[in-house]
Amino acid sequence: MAAAAAAAAATEQQGSNGPVKKSMREKAVERRNVNKEHNSNFKAGYIPIDEDRLHKTGLRGRKGNLAICVIVLLFILAVINLLITLVIWAVIRIGPNGCDSMEFHESGLLRFKQVSDMGVIHPLYKSTVGGRRNENLVITGNNQPIVFQQGTTKLSVEKNKTSITSDIGMQFFDPRTHNILFSTDYETHEFHLPSGVKSLNVQKASTERITSNATSDLNIKVDGRAIVRGNEGVFIMGKTIEFHMGGDVELKAENSIILNGTVMVSPTRLPSSSSGDQSGSGDWVRYKLCMCADGTLFKVQVTGHNMGCQVSDNPCGNTH
């Protein structure tokens, strides 16, 4: 402190009376003070070089684990991208010259240039699937049916059958002439079998009239039981009408049954009772079939042997 005061006094004296010469002792004291101050300033900015005192740099702890997860995720995405690229290159065959398997046109047409293996095809609204001109469009199912479906309408092509399911009907027409070949719109078009179709197999048919060509017969065949029912009657007309069945024939009508023409019944096919049976024995009720002169058929219950058709309540009137 004394040295500092002396230096300050000397400075003031030098500033007021001009430069003052210092002694050797004063110069040594001043030099020592300067070195001491310099050393103290150097130590103030000194940092010990110890591992524990250094600032830790880099990703450590949770940040390091998160960085590893991000790197692994990027690696997985790169592998998936590589697999997708290989599939696109192998299936679509995209190369330096373009795509070898398909073509994209400005009109929106997608053309396949080779055999394509697909599962389900969903065309867009009002789209068309077709083949090239003068070439067939071949659609093949590998041990599976080929199904064309739009809403509730479905066309299924299987190995042994082809089925069409529709709630509103169907029609077939020539794509070139647009002539209707077959239609189920009975109110507008009469039902005709297409050319080459000889038989129609249905479980149930509701129609006003069933006819055949003038040069062919109309045959109705069933494996089990056939029921022909009309809301206002059933009329069967033909040159010759034959019924062949292995079981019973049942004719029911609310008013009457009219057989107009020659009616032939083969007695060899009719069941007959044994000659030894009594007329009144057992639970059987027997009837005799009788005919009037005008062709009216009626039945008479058999109550005794050698009984004829002459009964009082027969519908023939005076003529039997």
From Swiss-Prot:
GO terms for cellular component: cytoplasm; cytoskeleton; dystroglycan complex; plasma membrane; sarcoglycan complex; sarcolemma. The chain crosses the membrane at residues 68-88. Residues 1-10 have a biased composition (Low complexity). Residues 1-34 are annotated as: Disordered. Residues 23-34 have a biased composition (Basic and acidic residues). It holds the Pfam family Sarcoglycan_1. It is found in: Cell membrane, Sarcolemma; Cytoplasm, Cytoskeleton. Disulfide bonds join C290-C316, C292-C309. It is a single-pass type II membrane protein. Glycans are attached at N160, N213, N260. Disulfide bonds are present. Keywords: Cell membrane, Cytoplasm, Cytoskeleton, Disulfide bond, Glycoprotein, Membrane, Signal-anchor, Transmembrane, Transmembrane helix. Residues 89-320 are extracellular. Most strongly expressed in skeletal and heart muscle. Also detected in proliferating myoblasts. GO terms for biological process: cardiac muscle cell development; gene expression; glucose homeostasis; glucose import in response to insulin stimulus; membrane organization; muscle cell development; muscle organ development; response to glucose. The keyword Transmembrane applies. Signal peptide: none annotated. Residues 1-67 are cytoplasmic. Component of the sarcoglycan complex, a subcomplex of the dystrophin-glycoprotein complex which forms a link between the F-actin cytoskeleton and the extracellular matrix. Cross-link to form 2 major subcomplexes: one consisting of SGCB, SGCD and SGCG and the other consisting of SGCB and SGCD. The association between SGCB and SGCG is particularly strong while SGCA is loosely associated with the other sarcoglycans. Belongs to the sarcoglycan beta/delta/gamma/zeta family. This is Beta-sarcoglycan.
